[in-house]
């Protein structure tokens, strides 16, 4: 033991060190354990349990992101609906379904109902311009096999039948509304999923050190020296690892910098907090069973897309509305108010300044959102639930998101990215994940990409096993309707998503 991180003794040697006990590390750990059972793994988590930050079910919307209802994945370009991003995200979510199904068949995952449940996905349009867009979006997707049984209606009676809670008190004569929907959607509890993975990992011999914060990563010969602080005793310990994965959410960028990963030079992070309104009133819950996504206001960022969601957590249904944007300098929900200021360095200050100059719309959105009180938030809720009673709803703080700011040439100098960015060094012995949505939903696809980048020499040897995990590996399901249908039926059954 040592009270100084610089003199911390190396007390263990492992093949793989996983930093952060969220869904990212859980997934990569499960993959590597199956591919190389003899490789030792160790997990470090600064909190006292798994999946307590972004993976926690009330810290995210739990949407199984497959672009069935999220309108920002089907932008309009030159008068046409571009579905390429929707197809890409849908394809990756099918990889998730296959991987989870395989883990259930292997007994690694044990209870699908604890982490995934069928919930219809609905797109909601208000006003003639949005309704026209939604109809054209529906026309662009309806015949694609990746979007099964999608339907559209601008009929008031159908709206009332499908969305009774959203119909109460609504004046259908004052504004045109329309919906498109599919019963192929899901609600996912990524916290429960991560916990099942880590339970299996611990049983297989993986050491999980909760209450340990990794404070330094340095190269020592052919290995990485990973130094962790025991947050309960204040002592420091070090381990040697051949491969390091940094799945530390908003703290990933700083750790990759400490490791000397040149690929993050110039990168910065923009923290965005959020709030939800939550209701557990059974009278409301029984009147709404869907994830309903609307369209962001003109000029507003993608993160501002409002949605009214059914959540299934620990077997209990609840309703979540939001997110309402907020701002905090923290890079984790349980982080420090100094996080943002500590992240500013000579190599990324121009990236920060460039984004500050460009993103007026984002700044205006965040300022407006921060100034909203509870009553103002309920007013926004009433666009979806006109009869909303403030007494039925409570405020819940969402997980902290850190959007990636990539360096760019003049005159921008910095580019704000909405999505997930995988980083690795040229040697492929350290990797990390930056960014936010739709990360959790497509984690298996991200980790397959990581394996290809960092363990390329092993991929031929691992090929058959990866094909077992993900039967469609190497094939684009968007180009193979027969295989898509086979995989859909297989995962529907294994994940217990079939209607009864």
Swiss-Prot record:
Which BP terms from GO are recorded? tricarboxylic acid cycle
Q: Which cofactors is this protein said to need?
A: FAD
Q: What is its EC number?
A: 1.1.5.4
Q: Does the keyword Transmembrane helix apply?
A: no
The yes or no answer to whether the keyword Flavoprotein is present is yes
State the family it belongs to.
Belongs to the MQO family.
The protein depicted here goes by the name Probable malate:quinone oxidoreductase
What is the protein's species of origin? Corynebacterium aurimucosum (strain ATCC 700975 / DSM 44827 / CIP 107346 / CN-1)
Gene that this sequence comes from:
mqo
